[in-house]
Amino acid sequence: MSRIGRAPVEVPGGVSVEISARSVKVRGPKGELTVPVGRGVSVREEDGKLLVERSSDAPQHRAMHGLTRSLLHNAVVGVTDGFAKTLQISGVGYRAQLQGQNVVLQVGYSHPVTVQPREGIQLEVPNPTTIVVRGIDKQQVGQMAAEIRRVRPPEPYKGKGIRYEGEQVRRKVGKAG
């Protein structure tokens, strides 16, 4: 048995779960998410918990077992608390500002770069060197943060660029001479 797949998913109060043949719909105070259920895996609700079971020990079914449980857990956390990812901007003159829902980045190019949020994602700029990406879908939040980071990834010599909060940038020594 998968250690991850075996663990039940707690369903807190205020969250409703609707189970159908190939998907599970999770509704909560922050919104609604639909989680697909793969082949060979079934989901049932028991005593305020979601239990994920698999039909056989085939490698594909074992893989889907843990994956489905993790996706369900992320959906429950997303509709109750939501997810956030913080990006730090470092570099002389590098900054971000909010224009409506879009973020305008000035990160060393000859022109400002405008980033539009995906549907269901909110972008915040608490100060000019910090961007916070918020949403209920963990995958979408991570994808949006990766797209913003890709505008100017941190470079290894001076560390200038956009990085995730807590990310360690491997530094290189410059040319001698």
UniProtKB/Swiss-Prot annotation:
Give the quaternary structure.
Part of the 50S ribosomal subunit.
Claim: rRNA-binding is one of the keywords in the record:
yes
Could you read off the lineage of the organism from its UniProt record? Answer: Bacteria, Bacillati, Actinomycetota, Rubrobacteria, Rubrobacterales
Q: Name one GO biological process term.
A: cytoplasmic translation
User: SUPFAM superfamilies, alphabetically?
Assistant: Ribosomal protein L6 (SSF56053)
Question: InterPro entries, per this entry?
Answer: Ribosomal_uL6-like, Ribosomal_uL6-like_a/b-dom_sf, Ribosomal_uL6_a/b-dom, Ribosomal_uL6_bac-type, Ribosomal_uL6_CS
Which species is listed as the source? Rubrobacter xylanophilus (strain DSM 9941 / JCM 11954 / NBRC 16129 / PRD-1)
What UniProt keywords are attached to this protein's entry?
Ribonucleoprotein, Ribosomal protein, RNA-binding, rRNA-binding
Which NCBIfam families does the entry mention?
A: L6_bact
Protein name, as recorded: Large ribosomal subunit protein uL6
Q: Does the keyword Ribosomal protein apply?
A: yes
Q: Name one GO molecular function term.
A: structural constituent of ribosome
